[in-house]
Curated annotation (Swiss-Prot):
Any single Gene Ontology cellular-component annotation: plasma membrane
Gene responsible for this protein: RIMBP2
Record lineage: Eukaryota, Metazoa, Chordata, Craniata, Vertebrata
Task of the protein: Plays a role in the synaptic transmission as bifunctional linker that interacts simultaneously with RIMS1, RIMS2, CACNA1D and CACNA1B.
Keyword Repeat annotated: yes
Protein's UniProt name: RIMS-binding protein 2
Length: 1325
């Protein structure tokens, strides 16, 4: 019992002790619970404090964004001002590192303020601290962030022991980094790098102290250059170091403007601009130099927090997925919650996906772990992903994913390249683990590092049409021990791709239209497309910009960074265009049209005409030396020379505001098509085999030869009955007889050509001759080398047919004289002329003094272009004797007139012009000469020249000393003749139109007569002259089917002196035709003068052609002021071509082929008052030619049409048609295998440069095929481009005559026959 009692006491004691211990433990638990509550409160307080600090920093960020926007705009303005120099290779706004303007909002540029503190996410203890978890910058706008060149290099990479300490220290470092940085002293200069420079490739021992440079990039330099030639410099991304002075150019020395720019750039250094899009796109991928440079490292690579982690439209994704446990049939994975910016929203839950299939949904607040079962780990591979579920959508599953199962390797899979362009590509892959970062290698060179949770990469600044090999190597954040060794070692994936060939550039942006500097122009402005440092867009080398209206180029500027140009309103009104577009021009073609810019309606309204002010007198220019021309014309000479060399460009492309430097080849070989990148058309129908093509060529050649022989026999038969005169040149030049009519290009033809849009076949020698396309009506003296240059330019013209039909070519056609003793003149066929505008020829410069007089006489009578028979039949009238009373004793021997000329011209007061006429774009010289005036005014005053003076002059010069008196007339002048005095001179005669005609032609005969007998007096009888005329007439060119006098009022003068337009029946001045006669035809110099027969025996009205007689009913002295229509022979811009100061206000611009309405006669300055596009102003007479309209209806139709069609037939006879020189290019005969009408089949814009032909036509081609697949050929007297795949060469063993008879000269002018297909010249050797 005692033992039991003791035992009980002992148990009670132990029980009490246990109760005491329990109480103590309970008290301890209570204390711990209280401590936990207090700790939780303390933690919540700390969190609240941090949130307040975040809001404060966020507000500061917004403030900085506003300041940054202001500074960015100021920087952009500064760069635009600095852009006055050529920034093609130095514009930072369009360089490879910047795809957008720095004036973008801060939400796009400064969204990376929350940056990670290290390259990886993991710390040794497994904890991590990312500033972006506490600081969320503003949202970004747009689909993709901007590509920037700024890389922060100052963020702290050090790690602290605790997350809070790391956060505090890094925040302090971030806030103080830009203020603690040392500032250089001295003056700040903005520079641009001229060349790329890698210090490690340089010769210096300390390359790390130098800055790497990229050509075209901006940088700052401080102070002065040191003794070694280096500056202290800073790049825009904050890097500082030494800069070699010979590698940079100074842009601006304005320190005040640079101060704000520098501060804005330093503010950018606080921000991380690299990042990726929603898919993790890394945009900061372009290294400082081009891609194929040496191994490039961007330091720490891309930072942890990127643009993809922020933004209202980007859903925060879970982070750091981890494989906790892998079993045979299941796995356990864990992750960390996403970082949600304040105010963005809340995360509702998480989806756990297996191969994109949702296996479970875990609510927010639960453990971030999941057990995934029913997996066959040993045989299959599974992709497990974690996805955030929010009210704004789900996060990207590939940003938190990993692979488990069989054959899992470290390397990424499904590596592919998409969106390949000329200079960029997009690389994507499927990561094995979203925690892995990836290293990008390009062509076996390390290129960049892509951070974790990103699986896309954008390449920029690639080279067009180049193959690239890309390697992506996974870089695990920790060793994947769960994988076997061989699977851990597989870290790389490869893919190859090729960039696209350089293609059309991007179009300009923001096209606007506003009023130009003058009332006649508008200014079109645009924003150039983004250009790389080498001046390319989409891999195409940008050369300039073209302005288009209704598909036609109306203006062009050749400058890659041009932002505006002027467009003539006249062209827009003619096209009835109300809007314009702009295209980027490049060597690889044009871009697509830009956005349409409407032309303000008030700009399209034509201005009211300005009253004509009295012209101011201008001093006359000397004529002797070439430098005098420079002094007289100043800059206009060079401008007009450029126009001269480029005026034949196709009007489809408009005019070039900055004409390129001409480069005319010496031959046709290597000739390019008029338009770049000409497209070769494809034949329609069944292809013709080679054997059939050769058979066609042989058959066609034989058929044409037989047809020619039959037609020649028929023509000769008709000719024997109808011809009045015979000459051996008939076979060359064709036959003009009543039975063989040549169809002229009348006004009806002009209109039909425009309406039908089809180019008819014409032969040489049948075209309507109007004003010369190469000279002025006022004498502009051109030397032979200039003539040769223009002849080459005509060949370069691509066969284009001008509406202004060349009188030069008409002269060349007529100048088929042979270098024999029997010198004779090819007499024009004035029996078949109507609708011919009156023109003046300019006087040539005589190179050899010994032959001056003979050459002048020769050129006076040479090359009279004949006019064609009108399509309106008129009754012929019998000839009647010449009326002697109409002579008025006006005619004297030529020598008397010449010898008395000096006295007369010395007293002439009307020879000084007050307004300078614009030069013809082709001539390059002034458009008038005093020698013209001397001859013209003398012909009127020779009535009062006494016979004694004349005879004494001749008596003293038995050796024809009239050559000496002629030399002052041949001196080169640049002053303009007084046109009104000439008109007054002829108008005062009061006689019919026959008198000037007789004087002109007869004088040449008298000059010839004087050459044989210098002491002849003025007692020369009409009978003597008639006898001489009848004798010499036999030597005249038989091309003239009628007497020389058959012409409209003074048409013999005007067609001999083709150049100055005037109305029918209005007296006009007379001038020599010599310059045109030698222009391009290279007629040999003659020791004897050419003989111009008199027309005494044929001078009466009855002997005139009825066409001429009816045209000349109006008395020239009593003609009323009438309205006439003219056609522009050249493009004319008074702003650049006129030497007159009031040109823009008073003179009208016009384009070649434009119809102009003219009121009255030209004034004393040689200007007409005309109207174009409802605007009235002055028009230089040497730039236009009159069109003789049959009636008012025809005139109205022409005025309504506005322009003559470009397919108007024009003589385009090459310059060596009559010379002994031959083309240096080869000529071949080709037969057409298919029908071809460029207006229907050609894919090219300038269809007027191409020839129309039918199957079986024989086409003569010159030279070799050009690079676009076109020949330059001739058919039926027209030259142009012909597609090579439509032709087959005619066999050499077949003799083909393409003209009516074998000619003694190459390139003879054929006649037009009645055959359906006209014959062109033959080239049988």
């Amino acid at each position: 019992m005692r033992e039991a009692a003791e035992r009980r006491q002992q148990l009670e004691l132990e029980h009490e002790q246990a109760l005491a211990v329990l109480n103590a433990k309970q008290q301890e638990i209570e204390l711990l619970q209280k401590a936990q509550v207090e700790a939780k409160k303390e933690h919540e307080g700390a969190v609240q404090l941090l949130e307040a600090k975040v809001r404060e920093l966020e507000e500061k960020c917004r403030t900085q964004s506003e300041q940054f926007n202001l500074l960015s705009r100021e920087l952009e303005k500064f760069r635009q001002q600095a852009g006055k120099i050529d920034l093609l290779s130095s514009n930072p706004l369009t360089s490879s590192d910047i795809s957008g303007s720095p004036s973008k909002s801060l939400s796009q540029l400064m969204n990376g303020i929350a940056t990670s503190l290290g390259k990886g996410h993991e710390s040794p203890s497994g904890s991590r601290c990312v500033i972006s978890e506490f600081i969320r910058p503003l949202q970004i706008s747009g689909d993709k962030p901007e590509q920037l060149s700024v890389k922060p290099t100052f963020l702290s990479k050090s790690r602290s022991d605790t997350p809070r300490c790391r956060f505090d220290s890094d925040m302090d470092n971030d806030q103080n980094s830009n203020t603690s940085k040392q500032r250089y002293s001295g003056k700040v200069h903005l520079c641009i790098a001229r060349y790329s420079y890698n210090p490690f490739d340089g010769p210096n021992e300390n390359p790390e102290a130098e800055l790497p440079l990229t050509a075209g990039k901006y940088l700052y330099v401080y102070g002065d250059m040191d003794e070694d030639g280096f500056y202290e410099g800073e790049l825009l991304d904050g890097q500082r170091g030494l800069v070699p002075s010979n590698f940079v150019d100074f842009v601006q020395d304005n320190e005040t403007r640079l101060s704000s720019t520098l501060s804005s750039e330093q503010d950018q250094n606080f921000i991380n601009h690299s990042g990726s899009t929603l898919e993790g796109d890394i945009l900061e991928i372009s290294p400082p130099s081009h891609i194929d440079s040496s191994v490039i490292s961007n330091g720490a690579g891309t930072l942890d927090v990127n643009i993809d982690e922020i933004g209202e439209d980007i859903v925060p994704y879970p982070r750091k997925i981890t494989l906790i446990k892998q079993l045979a049939k299941s796995v356990i994975v864990g992750w960390e919650p996403p970082v949600v910016p304040p105010g963005w929203g809340t995360i509702n839950s998480y989806n756990v996906l297996v191969d994109k299939e949702v296996r479970m949904n875990i609510a927010l607040g639960s453990r971030t772990k999941a057990l995934i079962e029913k997996l066959n780990i040993s045989t299959c591979t599974y992709r497990i992903s974690i996805q955030s579920i929010t009210n704004k959508g789900n996060s990207d599953e590939l940003q938190c994913t990993l692979l488990v199962g069989k054959d899992v390797v470290v390397a990424p899979s499904n590596l592919k390249v998409d969106n390949i362009t000329q200079i960029s590509a997009e690389l994507s892959w499927l990561p094995t683990n979203s925690n892995y970062s990836h290293v990008i290698f390009l062509n076996e060179e390390e290129f960049d590092i892509v951070k974790a949770a990103s699986y896309k990469y954008h390449f920029f600044n690639l080279k067009p049409n180049m193959a690239y090999k890309v390697k992506v190597m996974a870089k695990p954040h920790q060793m994947p021990w769960q994988l076997p060794l061989e699977q851990r070692e597989k870290k790389e994936a490869f893919v190859e791709f090729s960039t696209l060939p350089a293609g059309p550039p991007a179009p300009p942006q923001d096209v606007t239209v506003r009023a130009g500097s003058t009332q006649a122009t508008i200014q079109v402005s645009w924003k150039p497309p983004a250009l790389t440092a080498t001046g390319t867009s989409h891999g195409a080398n940008v050369t300039g910009y073209g302005v288009y209206a209704k598909g036609q180029r109306v203006a062009e500027v050749i400058f890659p960074t041009a932002e505006n140009t002027l467009v003539e309103l006249m062209r827009l009104r003619n096209l009835e265009a109300k809007e314009v577009t702009v295209r980027t021009l490049s060597a690889q073609g044009e871009s697509v049209d830009s956005s349409v810019a409407a032309i303000p309606s008030d700009l399209l309204v034509p201005p009211s005409p300005h009253p004509r002010t009295a012209p101011k007198s201008k001093p006359l220019a000397s004529a002797g030396a070439p430098e005098t021309k420079e002094e007289h014309l100043g800059p206009h000479l060079k401008i007009d020379e450029s126009w001269e060399q480029t005026h034949s460009a196709s009007p489809v492309h408009g005019h070039t505001l900055e004409p390129p430097v001409p480069n005319f080849p010496s031959s046709l070989q290597g000739r390019r098509s008029p338009s770049p990148n000409r497209i070769l058309p494809q034949p329609q129908g069944t292809p013709v085999p080679n054997t059939v093509a050769k058979a066609m060529a042989r058959e066609a050649a034989q058929r044409v030869a037989e047809s020619n022989r039959m037609e020649r026999r028929s023509v000769f038969s008709e000719r024997s009955n109808a011809a009045q005169y015979a000459n051996s040149d008939d076979e060359e030049d064709g036959y003009d007889s009543p039975n063989v009519k040549r169809r002229g290009a009348s006004v009806d033809d002009f209109l039909k050509g425009s309406e039908l849009g089809k180019q008819p076949h014409y032969c040489h020698g049948e075209d309507y001759h109007t004003e010369s396309s190469r000279g002025s009506d006022l004498s502009d003296i051109m030397e032979e080398d200039e003539e040769e240059l223009y002849s080459e330019m005509q060949l370069e013209d691509g066969g284009r047919r001008r509406v202004s039909l060349t009188s030069h070519n008409a002269l060349k056609e007529c100048n088929k004289n042979k270098t024999t003793d029997a010198t004779f003149l090819e007499q024009p066929d004035f029996s078949q002329q109507i609708h011919h505008s009156k023109k003046l020829f300019s006087i040539p410069e005589v190179a050899e003094e010994d032959g001056e007089y003979s050459e002048l006489l020769y050129k006076q009578g040479l090359g009279m272009p004949y006019k064609k028979k009108s399509t309106i039949a008129r009754d012929s009238r019998p000839p009647r004797p010449y009326n002697q009373d109409q002579q008025h004793n006006f005619w004297y021997p030529a020598k008397h007139r010449i010898s008395g000329m000096e006295d007369f011209t010395a007293d002439d007061k009307g020879c000084k012009y007050s307004r300078s006429l614009s030069r013809s774009p082709d001539s390059g010289l002034d458009c008038g000469s005093e020698e013209e005036e001397s001859r013209f005014t003398f012909r009127y005053t020779c009535d009062s020249v006494s016979a004694n003076v004349a005879s004494s002059c001749c008596a003293d010069t038995a050796d024809c000393s009239c050559r000496k008196s002629m030399r002052p007339l041949l001196a080169r002048r640049k002053t303009l003749t007084r046109q009104t005095s000439i008109e007054e001179d002829f108008g005062d005669l009061g006689s019919s139109f026959v008198e000037p005609r007789s004087e002109q032609v007869k004088s040449s005969y008298e000059k010839k007569y004087e050459t044989q007998k210098c002491n002849r007096t003025d007692n020369l009888s009409n009978e003597d002259i008639q006898g001489g005329w009848k004798n010499d007439l036999k030597m005249a060119d038989s091309r003239a089917a009628g007497p020389l006098a058959k012409s409209s009022h003074r048409d013999a003068e005007d067609s001999l002196l083709l150049g100055n337009p005037s109305s029918a029946g209005r007296p006009e001045r007379v001038e020599h035709a010599g310059r045109r006669s030698s222009h391009g035809s290279a007629v040999p110099q003659r020791s004897r003068p050419m003989l111009v027969p008199s027309i005494d025996g044929y001078g009466g009205h009855d002997h005139l052609s009825p066409d001429i007689y009816e045209e000349s009913e109006t008395d020239p002295g009593t003609e009323d002021i009438s309205t006439r229509i003219f056609v522009a022979l050249f493009d004319y811009d008074p702003l650049t071509m006129s030497p007159n100061p009031d040109a823009a206000e008073e003179e009208l611009p016009f384009k070649e082929g434009q119809i102009i309405k003219v009121y009255g006669d030209k004034d004393a300055d040689g200007f007409y008052r005309g109207e174009t596009c409802t605007r009235i102003g002055l028009i230089p007479c040497n730039m236009v030619s009159e069109i003789q309209a049959d009636d008012e209806e025809m005139m109205d139709q022409l005025l309504k049409q506005g322009f003559l069609p470009l397919n108007t037939p024009v003589e385009k006879i090459e310059r060596n048609r009559r010379s002994g020189r031959q083309h240096s290019v080869s000529t071949r005969r080709m037969v057409a295998l298919y029908d071809y009408d460029p207006r229907e089949s050609s894919p090219n814009v300038d269809v007027e440069a191409e020839l129309t032909f039918c199957t079986g036509d024989i086409i003569t081609v010159f030279g070799e095929i050009d690079e676009d697949g076109f020949y330059y050929g001739e058919l039926n007297g027209q030259k142009g481009l012909v597609p090579s795949n439509f032709l087959e060469e005619v066999p050499d063993d077949v003799e083909v005559y393409l003209s009516d008879a074998p000619s003694r000269y190459l390139h003879d002018t054929p006649m037009r026959t009645k055959a359906k297909r006209k014959k062109s010249v033959h080239f049988t050797p």
